[in-house]
């Protein structure tokens, strides 16, 4: 019976054959990921680094950027949503069916760390995001006054997170540092 199905699929559509084998052998799971954070935290740079492994000059995101990226055995459908105040009010429109949140923090922006904390906890407490993993990137570690991971955990009260998987990684999206480790963790927790 298996041979018959296999031959029928191959003759009918090669794409269907590959989809069948991806399904049969556990490859190709798609995860819907939101990349959120305050404006100028490095969300778009991080997404571009994942997409092409190259840094590039970005401009403030008006609305959102979407990329589909293969990462190991997963396919990430990633939405990088603008972090300006007017766009943060719209984030909730993207929460349905979300599999994980990537929250990017500008580690050098001490003045807005309390705003980042409020936004992070608003997400952590949102009922539509209950039980999904959160990956925090302490970004811009290349800057001389960037706070380290331990300081950001303290400033954002992340040790109070309960009943969900979470991790924080120091990163520099412009250089690509720390991103792979974070997404390896995320892949294992989806």
Predicted ranges, named:
Residues 2-3, 7-190:
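TRAFAC-class small GTPase G-domain
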């Amino acid at each position: 019976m298996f041979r018959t199905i296999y031959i029928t699929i191959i003759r009918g559509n090669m794409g269907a054959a590959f989809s069948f084998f991806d399904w049969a052998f556990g490859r190709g799971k798609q995860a819907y990921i939101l990349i959120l954070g305050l404006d100028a935290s490095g969300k778009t740079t991080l997404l571009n680094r994942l997409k092409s492994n190259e840094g590039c000059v970005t401009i403030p995101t008006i609305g959102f950027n979407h990329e589909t990226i293969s990462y190991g055995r997963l396919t990430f459908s990633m939405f990088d949503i603008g972090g300006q105040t007017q766009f943060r009010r719209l984030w909730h429109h993207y929460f349905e069916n979300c599999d994980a949140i990537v929250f990017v923090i500008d580690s050098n922006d001490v003045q807005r760390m309390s705003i980042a904390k409020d936004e992070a906890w608003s997400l952590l407490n949102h009922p539509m995001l209950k039980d999904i993993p959160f990956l925090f990137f302490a970004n811009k570690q290349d800057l001389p006054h960037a706070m380290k991971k331990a300081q950001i955990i303290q400033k954002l009260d992340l040790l109070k997170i309960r009943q969900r998987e979470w991790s924080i990684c120091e990163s520099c999206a412009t250089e690509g540092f720390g991103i792979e480790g974070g997404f390896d963790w995320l892949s294992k927790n989806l």
